[in-house]
A protein has these predicted regions:
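Donor-binding and catalytic core of enzymes assembling or modifying cell-surface/extracellular glycoconjugates
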Residues: 167-258
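A short, glycine/small-residue-rich beta-strand->loop->alpha-helix junction that serves as a flexible
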Residues: 9-19, 143
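Nucleotide-activated donor-dependent transferases that construct or modify glycoconjugates
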Residues: 1-11
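Histidine-anchored nucleotide/phosphate-binding helix
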Residues: 18-28, 155-163
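A structural signal for short, well-ordered beta-strand segments and their strand-loop junctions
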Residues: 5-6, 34-40, 133-135, 173-175, ...
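Secretory-pathway luminal glycosyltransferase catalytic domains
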Residues: 4, 40-169, 265-273
């Protein structure tokens, strides 16, 4: 049985899970074989994440690949050999940015389409959504990677750059999962003072924030997979931290190198600041 898939749901939030699905769809399309994976609720939020078929292991005759093997240069050739022998490929489930950098054969928005929409409260309050969204990611990021919680100066520099492009009066929305983010208070105060901040109660922050980032003209982005995937399946361009990209490239991170070089399919880099 020729197929490719994962056995268990990956750890982490929605962005991590969506990256796994995108990578599965990329490889399924490349090899022309069905994909399979755990049946989770994300399929109600994203078109293309359908209920995967389930086959008995005896029929699959699987060959297992761990994360290190998936990232090796020889992986695609080895996987092709397995599939040509009518066996299946089963991968460890953390197929995140490093895998997408290797398997971005098609733009993600060709493979999946999100069903997220701006909540009713925001539509009633503001009528239209902000062209600029700031994504502030905090919480566990402080312990995940030094420098991953971006400084307030990054967001201010990005807003200054957008002002030079004629967006000095454009409305701004702040999306964050962390009310204690060190940049939140200062940014909110200044944007509120100038009448640019879109704020108010939200019916469903998770879905509404994702929709806002996917629909925005520009997202001033954290390194979060939640923000990155919104840009990949949406229509926004992104401003990223030059300091963050430098640090990741120094560690050999192909994903961020491709973002800098504007060679990651489906990603639109507006600028680094």
């Amino acid at each position: 049985m020729r197929a490719i898939g994962i056995r268990s749901t990956p750890k982490g939030g929605f962005g991590n899970r969506l990256l796994n699905y995108i990578n599965l769809r990329e490889l399924s399309s490349l090899f022309g074989v069905p994909w399979f994976g755990p049946n989770v609720g994300d399929r109600r939020l994203v078109r293309g994440i359908h209920r995967p078929r389930r086959w008995p292991e005896a029929l699959l005759q699987p060959v297992f690949f761990d994360r290190e093997e998936i990232l090796e240069e020889e992986f695609l050739e080895r996987a092709s050999d397995v599939l040509s022998n009518r066996r299946s490929v089963i991968m460890k489930p953390r197929l995140l940015t490093e895998a997408l950098a290797r398997f971005d054969f098609l733009p993600p928005r060709q493979l999946v389409r999100h069903r997220f929409s701006i909540c009713g409260s925001h539509r009633r309050q503001h009528g239209k959504e902000a062209p600029i969204v700031l994504h502030l990611r905090g919480t566990d990021f402080a312990t995940w990677q030094p420098g991953a919680v971006l400084e307030e100066s990054f967001y201010r520099n990005a807003l200054d750059l957008l002002a030079e492009q004629g967006l000095q009066d454009a409305a701004v929305r702040i999306c964050t999962d962390d009310p204690e983010h060190p940049a939140l208070e200062g940014l909110s105060m200044d944007l509120r003072r100038t009448g640019r901040l879109l704020e108010g109660p939200c019916d469903n922050p998770f879905q509404c924030d994702f929709a806002a980032m996917a629909q925005a003209q520009t997202v001033v982005s954290s390194p979060s997979t939640f923000a990155i995937t919104a840009a990949l399946v949406g229509h926004s361009s992104a401003i990223h931290s030059r300091k963050w990209i430098d640090s990741r490239i120094q560690k050999g991170d192909l994903f961020w190198r491709k973002i800098r070089n504007r060679t990651l399919r489906g990603h639109r880099l507006f600028a680094e600041v």
